[in-house]
């Protein structure tokens, strides 16, 4: 515990909060172009082939974004919209691609949580 004199000589340091989605620069979403679409494997207890894409954003930054849902139509030069939100078992993946916008199609035959995957209401 510092004395009053110590506080007068050196003021307390502010704790700097780290942004969880720095590439969005305070925006809710950002547009970008896929530079590479590939699969990667998750961290230790899990096993799968997770679909991810490298995306060059309109602000010039390049990030890795997760492609949610079953099946996708993305390839190189696809224009996508990304949002914040990390994938817990993929290190370095801090963003999600939004399904059903721009060049990204919605998930086919999706019946529950459709709005999260850009799927239309089934007839």
Swiss-Prot record:
Chain positions found as 3-methylthioaspartic acid: 89
UniProt feature, compositional bias: Basic residues: 111-123
Region span, Disordered: 102-123
Gene3D superfamilies assigned: Nucleic acid-binding proteins
One Gene Ontology term of the molecular function aspect: tRNA binding
Alphabetized UniProt keyword annotations: Methylation, Ribonucleoprotein, Ribosomal protein, RNA-binding, rRNA-binding, tRNA-binding
Pfam families (UniProt xref): Ribosom_S12_S23
Superkingdom of origin: Bacteria
GO BP of this protein: translation
Tagged with keyword Repressor: no
Gene Ontology CC: small ribosomal subunit
Transmembrane segments: none
Protein family: Belongs to the universal ribosomal protein uS12 family.
Function text: With S4 and S5 plays an important role in translational accuracy.
Subunit organization: Part of the 30S ribosomal subunit. Contacts proteins S8 and S17. May interact with IF1 in the 30S initiation complex.
Protein name, entry field: Small ribosomal subunit protein uS12
Organism encoding this protein: Lawsonia intracellularis (strain PHE/MN1-00)
Record gene name: rpsL
